[in-house]
Amino acid sequence: MLIPRKVAHRKQHHPKRTGAAKGGTRIAFGEYAIQSLESAYVTNRQIESARIAMTRHIRRGGKVWINIYPDRPLTKKPAETRMGSGKGSPEWWVANVKPGRIMFELSGVAEPVAREAMRRAIHKLPMKCRFVTREGGA
């Protein structure tokens, strides 16, 4: 699982999920990519699940790059706890993904194989995404 080793502060404010992605909107490493169309929190488990779905489909061929990292803790208070008495403890780590962000990249396989691998990975993610190629768009 992707989790930061050391953090300056255990708890953070919730980031805004509005607006488009400022960076990471172009394919940097691979030939094919998954681009987000909505904003969402993507947990470390969802990232790992999508990675496994892709790598199992492409088998030995190809290389996968993960361009998002879950660097924000989300907190939760225990069940049946009264209101107040501080913020809850960190439960899971999320990446704040905005529309237009390239999340996963893939190269070294044919386009039909890449399209199917990415389709399987998209089903593991909590927002609408699309398959894009380096040549241009969907």
UniProtKB/Swiss-Prot annotation:
Q: Name one GO biological process term.
A: translation
Q: Name one GO cellular component term.
A: cytosolic large ribosomal subunit
Q: Which residues form a coiled coil?
A: none
Q: Provide this UniProt record's keywords sorted from A to Z.
A: Ribonucleoprotein, Ribosomal protein, RNA-binding, rRNA-binding, tRNA-binding
Q: Enumerate the GO terms in the molecular function aspect.
A: rRNA binding; structural constituent of ribosome; tRNA binding
Q: Which portions of the sequence form the region Disordered?
A: 1-22
By what name is this protein known?
Large ribosomal subunit protein uL16
What is the native source organism of this protein?
Answer: Parafrankia sp. (strain EAN1pec)
Q: What is the lineage of its organism?
A: Bacteria, Bacillati, Actinomycetota, Actinomycetes, Frankiales
